[in-house]
């Protein structure tokens, strides 16, 4: 042991040398002696005590030597005892916690350490005065002080916390010390006391000096000894018990009190001591110094920095003996429930005597010591705070005197030191309970835990006494392990501190009643009425002191006992009453009055402490029970509120409460307390309401029951008045001005005032009122009539009661009988009657109730005889109501009552159901004649069930809707007509002679009519004359059809209401159902009226049957007849419009009359989908090219079929064509339309009506369609067919009869864009007489292709038979003049003379068919304008106008005498996979720019079919170039080139600058070479649409990609399709550029075709590739093709600059060297850089400036360019043979470089193509690239959104090029864009 001590001494000396900064020096005279004494005494004590010498001491020394200094210093609770520790103030501060922990044995070790420290600091020993101070020093403390002064010890915090709270070890050690015996303790305590007395004088000065010295920086020193083994698991955050604010007073009182208590220092371990709870050095955090107002001064004293972390400040008065303290030191984790009887008695002096301090000091001396300590401590902590110190000391002295007086008055003989300590909380240790009488370790430990930053740490104790508020407890809620309802928003929690401390019922604490929100006591609503426990008279100092112990776990631990001068006022709540007691006297007995009475007269102190401990110990169950009990505890307060009239919240004494509160009130309060255990705000309000209303009412009832006489009732208001509104008295509320209460009570006061006002009228004398009918006849008029027993009892006594009493009676009685209706105690009449407005005057005189829905029943006056007067006989039964009175009956007769029962005398109009007087013969509303059988028929058939009903008074509501017997119902429109009406007033259907039906409801259900027959299918009753059911058209059983022809026509008028509504939708027996579309068709229909599917196994009814049917039908034979064909009408099979029989074509869609066509047998248009080709919906008019063999219908793609019907012209269609279409009914309208039509023709572009004499539209100058102008077509020259712009169904008349032989190429009928179902008559191919081609118009879905009936939905693989190709061998020599395609919304069916197929043009001549805007497939029969080239005729495919992807006019100029059948299957939406043995050019439609006409340059190359709108890639034959770019406005210019793979540029922003022909978006012409099987979805070298934005890709499968062999189609859905250069013929989409010298027809596509909307179709130079500029951006400009295959620059519209890049090694076209293919200038800002043309909308098309004012530039060698109709400024280049495009908005047709009208941004520059504005993505290719080199795209176009442009002019290009000549350089400035900066949110 001594060896270890020597080692410690040596190590400490070394540390002292190492750390010279330890300022705590010990006086030389004291140091040696005292330390030796201390060592000896402590050693002796250790030897005496226990095995502590051997076990504890050695273990501690060893552990301390093992552990590092930081750990040992923190963990070893310095165990030196109070003699040494308390000798000097500095030591006191360090040893106080240790001593309060009661470690007696550790004194020796401390003494040893002090001796060692004194030796170490011997040089500075003379600074100290006496040994007592030196003994107070502890090396651990000094080292810790050094550590704290120098460092924050952040790393050691956790270990410190753990060791600091290691109560278990400390208790263990203390237990060992306690076992050693009390003799040594007493001796040490005596020694400590002596030291204390000696050092009293010196403490003040020396402590400050020592503290300053210690505050001087002291280096860290290892603590060589750890006095207790460190058990880290036990040291982790032991649970804290009390949240009492930290008490700096511990330090203040350290020296005196600890000396006074020699063995046990009860000074709380203040942080300033640097000792933790167990005497070991504390953490660096000082407790809040409550003595000093200046916290900063503490920093200068070397104090620990303030920390929010709560620190433990155990009150020094916690326990007197070491043993008791040992118990209180039980570690919290292992803490057993402390004994209910605390170790300490309530008498501090006795405790001191027990601990050996009794003889040493009196309480006065103790107080002096405490004052001295506090003063010294204050001086030490802050030299500058002398004023504060003095004030604190003065206050302490003052309170000491007060406390001494109070304690003297107490029987408890509580020491003043306790009171002083406790009341020095604000100064010394705010929140320490100096006298925890029944406190255990939990209480002390938790009671002294508080936040250093607590806002309630107040240095002014006087203020604290008055300002103790629940926020203290709220602040420490987290510190207590107990449920606190205040956290959870309970109203009673904040208002009612009872819940803040469940323990506080028996022992009051001021905090319990203090409000957290305002100064003063917490009260519900601002009043303290709910808090019965706060009363100075109720609380005694002893109870308060006992409450102090509970306060740690009790009500509000932060609230100290503010003992006032009178004996300590315990601001605590009483504990739960553990014994039966009178609620009134409980407060008095349990809480002593005035300090003269001990707490709990019937309970001993031990019992009280036990109960308090039980109460303080918290478990969830206890907390839950406590909440309920706390409510019960306040029954007395509630009783007082309820009973005290004047001051419900001010209760003087329980006796006065008992006097004022009746017994039943107490009972009710008890009852409510049981009901409302935990009152919510709603419950509290309800309780208040019940108190006002229900209880008062019950009281009144009770009083009335007790008192028999009315005079008693008159006297009743006196006792009743408090009950009526005890809470509502304004005077009472003015006294309590707290916020919540005053607010709530204010409402109550208002109610009370209103109640008083309402009482002014005379009282309601209910007893005189009797309601005999109340029980028997309930009323539905919302009038609650009080029954007689309700009021009779109180009222019989005296009708003249005082207003208040009578009102009270009313409310009471009603509350008992109708409690739900009592919302408030207002005793007005409305309680009984909802209708009453609360005025009693209404009851004083007889008045009618206001809210009755019928005749108001007058309330009787005071006479009872008035009651039976209103006889309410109305019964709400559905039978006839009994008449209430004569007046009502008369009114009911004269007028239907509200329930809708008409008077029997009135007659009801069967038409409009208006009831008319009997004398009126016509309905006043609809003038329908009065029924003949007026009332008798109506009444007679009434079933017996209705006989009981009083017919006069009640007629069913449904009767109003019954038909009149005389009225007859129109079978067509179901409208009831008057009997005299011969025909229906609505639809004029003639009346049928049917016997009038009896207007009964029941017979309809029960009895069958003799004159009706019931349909066995739909159970609908039909009239006898009807041969078939009107609903399902089932034949009448057992009856032959009277009208065989009309059997399937619902001629029979539908029966009246008897016929079910659903019967009309039932299938007729004769009708047949279409297998394709499931539509029921009439029996005579040979094919489905919707999808034209032929009827299976049914011979078609002769058309003659239709007229016979119609002739047999009576006029106006019913509603169904309106849907039947008239005799002289025929129904268009395409649009189902009825046409006159004289009309040869449909007036709506211009589909030829199938009958007429069948008679001609030229083209069977009634093509129903055969079984091979599935029809999806109604068939559109399709040209049936019988001779054409490879017609394919691909659903949604190639077929120009309507969306509704996929009709492919098949053999069945041919068979059907033989039969005549029956004439349609409704001839009048048709004739009118026909007459108008014959006299006028409608411009399909602008829909203007023009006189037949005009050949052009008067509005838009669109040329007259061939349909109106058959003469326009020339026999030998293929007149450019103008597709008609029709929103309806485009119908192209076949101008040429099939009889016409070859050599006459009929003007190619332009496929018309018909949104509906348009039939397009194909121009007969003169060259191939066998083939008739009817261009199909705008089939949304699929057009039926004739022979190879292959209906492919996704990909139309066109298998064209070799026959067509063989027949296609003979090209027509006649030069094909380009037919201008008109702007037709319907797909223009360009009838190719050569190919008769609508969609797939299987023509002998190589005429690519351009499908006009068939969403699926354009049935564009390309009119092969067989322009005789040198070797072969180059048929110019007529471009459909405004085919959304209208197949570009694939102009197949086969220079060699090849006969590739250019079959243009327009694969709509999908794929036109044309597997044609011969080269078929299928132009897909639905490209907004029609497919560019392909120009097979090589002789071998067949014309590429531009597949319109292939989402994916289009397959092209390698030889021919397929330009099917799905441009919405971009024409793909196919430059004549060798059949090398054309690179397809995908649109949508990436201009695919592919040398090959760029396929316009939807008009991607996929030309498959002969024997090239175009397998759809086969990879083609076409960049995907949508996918590659300008990226050139090969082998893309289009959406339904028609894979052509070796052909690269650029399906560009992007805006720019770069016109390919060399290899492919650069034909603009929709413009057929024929490179051969022969006139190249250029159909300007509408909206997509450059020809429309201002794409100027410019005839190019010598090779005369006519390039059409596409409107809307993608102008496929055929670059001027050099002889070596010059690139045609295709400028896409909408910023789509089509770069026609000259393909390297582009083969020379067979035509003479085409120097420059005229580039198509895309309109809308797509400049075609090739020719100098002012681009429309900023796109300068080089030669032809297309669109909106772009002048048409005449190419040097002008092939006849097909001018696009409806060019918005697109000037058609004036080619020698070019027909001027009709209605170019600003284009001068023939002027070579006309200024573009509507040239919004395009400048008509001759040489340079101005950059197109709005060039969304099109690249303008550099125009003049003589050789096959790529042309540089001109990017000057504004709005080239993703166009790759070399010029920087593209402002909106995502990366506009920095350099380059821009036509619009002024717009090249880029917008500044701020670099993105992340904005961090504020911290």
UniProtKB/Swiss-Prot annotation:
Residues reported to bind Zn(2+) 1: 909, 912, 923, 926
Comp. bias intervals (Polar residues): 73-101, 582-591, 637-657, 694-706, 1301-1323
Region: Disordered, residue numbers: 1-57, 70-116, 176-227, 400-439, 498-518, 580-604, 627-657, 694-769, 791-812, 1173-1197, 1301-1331, 1449-1473, 1597-1616, 1855-1883
Entry similarity comment: Belongs to the NUP153 family.
Compositionally biased spans, kind Acidic residues: 29-41, 182-209
GO terms for MF: chromatin DNA binding; nuclear localization sequence binding; structural constituent of nuclear pore; zinc ion binding
Binding residues for Zn(2+) 4: 1074, 1077, 1088, 1091
Tissue expr: Expressed in adult male accessory glands (at protein level).
Chain positions covered by the region annotation 22 X 2 AA repeats of F-G: 1287-1786
Biased composition (Low complexity): 498-515, 802-812
SUPFAM superfamilies referenced in this protein's UniProt entry, alphabetically: Ran binding protein zinc finger-like
Sequence repeat start-end pairs: 1287-1288, 1315-1316, 1317-1318, 1340-1341, 1353-1354, 1415-1416, 1469-1470, 1511-1512, 1528-1529, 1548-1549, 1586-1587, 1599-1600, 1613-1614, 1647-1648, 1653-1654, 1672-1673, 1694-1695, 1724-1725, 1737-1738, 1748-1749, 1768-1769, 1785-1786
Source species: Drosophila melanogaster
InterPro entries, sorted: Nucleoporin (IPR026054), Znf_RanBP2 (IPR001876), Znf_RanBP2_sf (IPR036443)
Residues reported to bind Zn(2+) 2: 970, 973, 984, 987
Domain comment quoted from the record: Contains FG repeats. FG repeats are interaction sites for karyopherins (importins, exportins) and form probably an affinity gradient, guiding the transport proteins unidirectionally with their cargo through the NPC. FG repeat regions are highly flexible and lack ordered secondary structure. The overall conservation of FG repeats regarding exact sequence, spacing, and repeat unit length is limited.
Residue positions binding Zn(2+) 3: 1015, 1018, 1029, 1032
Protein name: Nuclear pore complex protein Nup153
Keywords from the named record: Chromatin regulator, Chromosome, Cytoplasm, Cytoskeleton, DNA damage, DNA-binding, Membrane, Metal-binding, mRNA transport, Nuclear pore complex, Nucleus, Protein transport, Repeat, Transcription, Transcription regulation, Translocation, Transport, Zinc, Zinc-finger
Start and end residues, zinc fingers (RanBP2-type): 903-932, 962-993, 1009-1038, 1067-1097, 1126-1155, 1237-1266
One GO cellular component, as annotated: euchromatin
Cofactors demanded by this protein: Zn(2+)
Listed GO biological process terms: chromatin organization; chromatin remodeling; DNA damage response; mRNA transport; NLS-bearing protein import into nucleus; nuclear pore organization; positive regulation of transcription by RNA polymerase II; protein import into nucleus
Compartment list: Nucleus; Nucleus membrane; Nucleus, Nuclear pore complex; Chromosome
One Pfam family linked to the record: Zn_ribbon_RanBP
Cofactor: binding details: Binds at least 4 zinc ions per subunit.
């Amino acid at each position: 042991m001594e060896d270890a001590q020597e080692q410690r001494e040596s190590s400490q000396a070394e540390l002292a040398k190492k750390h010279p900064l330890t300022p705590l020096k010990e006086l030389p005279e004291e140091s040696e002696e005292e330390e030796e004494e201390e060592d000896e005494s402590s050693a002796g004590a250790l030897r005496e005590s226990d095995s502590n010498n051997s076990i504890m001491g050695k273990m501690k020394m060893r552990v301390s030597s093992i552990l590092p200094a930081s750990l040992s210093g923190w963990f070893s609770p310095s165990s030196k005892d109070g003699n040494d520790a308390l000798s000097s103030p500095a030591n006191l501060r360090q040893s106080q916690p240790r001593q309060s922990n009661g470690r007696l044995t550790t004194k020796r070790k401390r003494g040893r350490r002090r001796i060692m420290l004194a030796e170490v600091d011997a040089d500075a020993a003379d600074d100290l005065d006496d040994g007592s101070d030196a003994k107070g020093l502890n090396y651990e403390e000094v080292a810790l002080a050094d550590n704290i002064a120098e460092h924050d010890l952040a790393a050691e915090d956790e270990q410190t916390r753990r060791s600091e709270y290691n109560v278990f070890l400390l208790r263990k050690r203390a237990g060992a010390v306690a076992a050693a015996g009390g003799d040594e303790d007493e001796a040490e305590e005596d020694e400590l006391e002596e030291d204390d007395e000696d050092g009293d004088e010196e403490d003040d000065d020396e402590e400050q000096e020592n503290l300053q010295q210690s505050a001087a920086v002291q280096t860290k020193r290892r603590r060589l000894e750890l006095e207790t083994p460190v058990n880290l698991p036990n040291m982790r955050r032991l649970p804290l018990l009390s949240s009492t604010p930290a008490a700096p007073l511990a330090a203040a009182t350290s020296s005196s009190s600890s000396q006074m208590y020699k063995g046990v220092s009860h000074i709380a371990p203040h942080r300033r001591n640097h000792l933790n709870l167990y005497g070991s050095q504390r953490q660096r955090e000082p407790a809040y110094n409550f003595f000093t107002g200046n916290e900063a001064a503490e920093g200068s004293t070397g104090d620990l920095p303030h920390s929010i972390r709560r620190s433990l400040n155990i009150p020094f008065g916690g326990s007197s003996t070491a043993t008791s303290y040992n118990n209180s030191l039980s570690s919290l984790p292992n803490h057993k429930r402390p004994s209910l009887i605390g170790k300490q008695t309530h008498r501090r002096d006795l405790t001191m005597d027990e601990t050996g301090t009794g003889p040493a000091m009196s309480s006065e001396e103790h107080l002096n010591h405490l004052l001295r300590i506090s003063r010294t401590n204050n001086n030490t902590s802050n030299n500058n705070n002398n004023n504060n110190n003095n004030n604190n000391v003065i206050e302490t002295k003052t309170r000491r005197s007060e406390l001494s007086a109070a304690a003297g008055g107490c029987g408890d003989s509580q020491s003043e030191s306790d009171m002083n300590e406790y009341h020095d909380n604000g100064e010394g240790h705010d929140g320490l309970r100096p006298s925890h009488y029944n406190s255990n370790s939990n209480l002390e430990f938790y009671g002294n835990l508080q936040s250093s930053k607590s806002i309630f740490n107040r240095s002014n104790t006087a203020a604290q006494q008055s300002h103790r508020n629940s926020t203290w407890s709220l602040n420490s809620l987290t510190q207590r392990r107990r449920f606190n309802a205040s956290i959870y928003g309970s109203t009673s929690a904040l208002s009612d501190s009872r819940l803040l401390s469940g323990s506080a019922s028996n022992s009051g604490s001021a905090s319990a009643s203090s409000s957290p929100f305002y100064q003063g006591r917490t009260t519900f609503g601002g009043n303290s009425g709910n808090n019965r426990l706060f009363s100075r008279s109720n609380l005694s100092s002893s109870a308060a002191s006992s409450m102090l112990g509970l306060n740690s776990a009790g009500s509000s631990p932060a609230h100290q006992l503010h003992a006032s001068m009178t004996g300590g006022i315990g601001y605590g709540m009483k504990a739960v009453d553990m014994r039966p007691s009178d609620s009134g006297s409980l407060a008095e007995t349990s809480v002593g009055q005035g300090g003269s009475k001990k707490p709990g007269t019937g309970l001993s102190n031990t019992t009280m402490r036990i109960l308090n401990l039980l109460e303080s110990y918290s478990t969830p169950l206890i907390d839950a029970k406590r909440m309920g009990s706390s409510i019960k505890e306040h029954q007395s307060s509630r009783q007082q509120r309820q009973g005290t009239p004047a001051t419900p919240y001010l209760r003087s004494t329980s006796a006065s409460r008992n006097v004022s509160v009746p017994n039943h009130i107490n009972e009710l309060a008890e009852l409510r307390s049981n009901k409302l255990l935990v009152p919510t705000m709603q419950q509290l309000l309800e309780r208040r309401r019940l108190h006002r209303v229900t209880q008062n009412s019950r009281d009144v009832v009770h009083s009335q029951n007790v008192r028999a006489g009315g005079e008693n009732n008159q006297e009743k208001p006196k006792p009743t008045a408090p009950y009526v509104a005890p809470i509502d008295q304004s005077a009472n509320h003015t006294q309590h001005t707290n916020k919540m209460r005053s607010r709530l009570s204010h409402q109550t006061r208002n109610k009370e005032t209103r109640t008083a006002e309402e009482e002014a009228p005379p009282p309601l004398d209910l007893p005189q009122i009797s309601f005999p009918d109340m029980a028997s006849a309930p009323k539905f008029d919302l009038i609650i009539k009080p029954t007689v027993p309700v009021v009779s009892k109180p009222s019989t006594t005296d009708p003249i009661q005082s207003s208040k009493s009578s009102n009270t009676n009313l409310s009471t009685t009603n509350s008992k009988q109708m409690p739900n209706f009592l919302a408030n105690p207002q005793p007005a009449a409305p309680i009984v009657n909802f209708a009453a407005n609360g005025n009693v005057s209404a009851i004083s005189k007889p008045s009618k109730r206001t809210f009755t829905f019928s005749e108001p029943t007058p309330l009787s006056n005071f006479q009872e005889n008035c009651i039976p007067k209103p006889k309410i006989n109305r019964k709400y039964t559905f039978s006839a109501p009994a008449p209430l009175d004569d007046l009502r009956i008369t009114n009911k007769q004269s007028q239907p009552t509200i329930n809708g029962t008409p008077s029997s005398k009135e007659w009801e109009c069967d038409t409009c159901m208006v009831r008319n007087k009997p004398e009126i013969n016509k309905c006043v509303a609809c003038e329908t004649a009065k029924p003949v059988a007026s009332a008798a028929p109506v009444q007679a058939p009434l079933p017996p069930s209705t006989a009981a009903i009083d017919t006069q008074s009640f007629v069913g509501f449904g009767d109003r809707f019954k038909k009149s017997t005389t009225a007859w119902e129109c079978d067509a429109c179901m409208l009831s007509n008057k009997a005299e009406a011969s025909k229906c007033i609505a639809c004029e259907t003639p009346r049928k002679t049917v016997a009038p039906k009896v207007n009964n409801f029941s017979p309809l259900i029960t009895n069958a009519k003799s004159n009706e027959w019931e349909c066995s299918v739909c159970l609908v009753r039909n009239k006898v004359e009807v041969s078939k059911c009107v609903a399902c058209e089932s034949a009448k059983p057992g009856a032959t059809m009277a009208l065989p022809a009309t059997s399937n026509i619902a001629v029979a008028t539908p029966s009246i209401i008897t016929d079910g509504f659903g019967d009309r939708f039932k299938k007729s027996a004769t009708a047949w159902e279409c297998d394709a579309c499931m539509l029921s068709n009439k029996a005579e229909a040979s094919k489905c009226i919707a999808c034209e599917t032929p009827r299976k196994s049914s011979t078609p009814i002769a058309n003659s049957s239709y007229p016979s049917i119609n002739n047999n039908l009576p006029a106006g034979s019913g509603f169904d007849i309106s849907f039947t064909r008239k005799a002289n009408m025929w129904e268009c099979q395409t649009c189902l419009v009825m046409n006159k029989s004289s009309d040869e074509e449909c007036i709506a869609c211009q589909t030829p009359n199938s009958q007429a066509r069948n008679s001609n047998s030229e083209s069977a248009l009634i093509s129903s989908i055969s079984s091979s080709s599935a029809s999806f919906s109604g068939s559109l008019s399709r040209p049936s090219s019988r001779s054409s063999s490879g017609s394919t219908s691909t659903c949604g793609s190639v077929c120009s079929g309507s969306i509704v019907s996929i009709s492919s012209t098949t053999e069945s269609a041919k068979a059907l064509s033989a039969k005549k279409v029956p004439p349609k009914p409704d001839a009048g309208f048709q004739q009118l339309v026909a007459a108008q039509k014959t006299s006028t023709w409608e411009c399909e572009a602008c829909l203007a009506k023009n006189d037949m004499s005009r050949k052009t539209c008067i509005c838009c100058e669109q040329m007259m369609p061939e349909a109106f102008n058959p003469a326009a077509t020339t026999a030998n020259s293929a007149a450019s067919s103008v597709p008609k712009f029709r929103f309806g169904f485009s119908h192209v008349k076949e101008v040429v009869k099939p009889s016409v032989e070859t050599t006459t190429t009929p003007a190619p009928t332009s496929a018309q864009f018909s949104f509906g179902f348009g039939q397009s008559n194909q121009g007969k191919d003169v060259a191939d007489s066998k083939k008739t081609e009817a261009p199909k118009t705008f089939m949304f879905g699929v057009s039926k292709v004739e022979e190879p009936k292959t209906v492919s939905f996704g990909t139309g693989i066109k298998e064209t038979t070799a026959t067509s190709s063989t027949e296609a061998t003979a090209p027509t020599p006649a030069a094909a003049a380009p037919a201008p395609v008109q702007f037709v919304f319907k797909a223009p069916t360009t009838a190719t003379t050569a190919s008769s197929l609508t969609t797939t043009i299987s023509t002998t001549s190589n005429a690519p068919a351009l499908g006009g805007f068939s969403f699926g497939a354009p049935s564009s029969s390309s009119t092969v304008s067989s322009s005789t080239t040198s070797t072969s005729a180059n048929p110019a495919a007529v471009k459909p106008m405004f085919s959304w992807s209208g197949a570009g006019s694939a102009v197949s100029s086969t220079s060699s005498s090849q006969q590739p059948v250019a079959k243009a299957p327009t694969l709509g939406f999908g794929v036109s996979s044309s597997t044609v043995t011969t080269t078929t050019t299928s132009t897909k439609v639905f490209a907004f720019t029609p497919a560019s006409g392909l120009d097979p340059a090589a002789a071998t190359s067949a014309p590429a079919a531009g597949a319109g709108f292939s989402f994916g890639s289009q397959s092209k034959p390698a030889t021919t170039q397929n330009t099917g770019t799905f441009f919405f406005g971009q024409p793909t210019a196919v430059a004549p080139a060798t059949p090398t793979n054309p690179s397809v540029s995908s649109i949508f922003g990436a201009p695919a600058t592919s040398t090959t022909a760029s396929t316009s978006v939807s008009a991607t012409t996929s030309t498959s070479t002969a024997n090239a099987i175009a397998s759809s979805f086969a990879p083609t070298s076409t960049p995907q649409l949508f996918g590659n934005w300008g990226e050139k890709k090969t082998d893309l499968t289009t959406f339904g990609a028609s894979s052509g062999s070796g052909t690269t189609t650029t399906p560009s859905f992007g805006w720019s399709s770069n016109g390919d250069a060399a290899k492919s013929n650069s034909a603009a989409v929709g413009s057929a550029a024929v490179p051969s010298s022969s006139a190249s027809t250029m159909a300007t596509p509408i909206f997509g075709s450059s020809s429309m909307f201002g794409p100027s179709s410019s005839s190019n130079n010598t090779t005369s590739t006519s390039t059409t500029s596409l409107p809307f951006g993608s102008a496929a400009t055929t670059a001027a093709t050099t002889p070596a295959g010059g690139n045609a620059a295709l400028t896409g519209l909408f910023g789509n600059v089509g770069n026609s890049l000259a393909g390297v090694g582009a083969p020379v076209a067979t035509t003479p060297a085409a120097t420059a293919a005229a580039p198509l200038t895309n309109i809308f800002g797509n400049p075609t850089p090739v020719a100098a043309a002012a681009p429309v909308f900023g796109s300068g098309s080089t030669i032809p400036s297309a669109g909106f004012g772009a002048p048409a530039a005449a190419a040097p060698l002008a092939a006849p360019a097909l001018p696009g109709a409806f060019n918005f400024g697109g000037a058609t280049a004036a080619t020698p043979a070019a027909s001027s495009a009709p209605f170019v908005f600003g284009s001068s047709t023939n002027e070579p470089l006309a200024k573009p009208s509507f040239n919004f941004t395009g400048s008509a520059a001759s040489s340079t193509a101005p950059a197109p504005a709005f060039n969304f993505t099109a690249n303008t290719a550099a125009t003049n690239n003589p050789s096959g080199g790529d042309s540089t795209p001109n990017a000057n176009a504004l709005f080239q959104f993703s166009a790759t442009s070399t010029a920087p002019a593209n402002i909106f290009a995502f990366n506009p090029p920095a350099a380059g000549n821009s036509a619009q350089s002024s717009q090249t400035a880029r917008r500044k864009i701020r670099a993105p900066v992340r904005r961090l949110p504020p911290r």
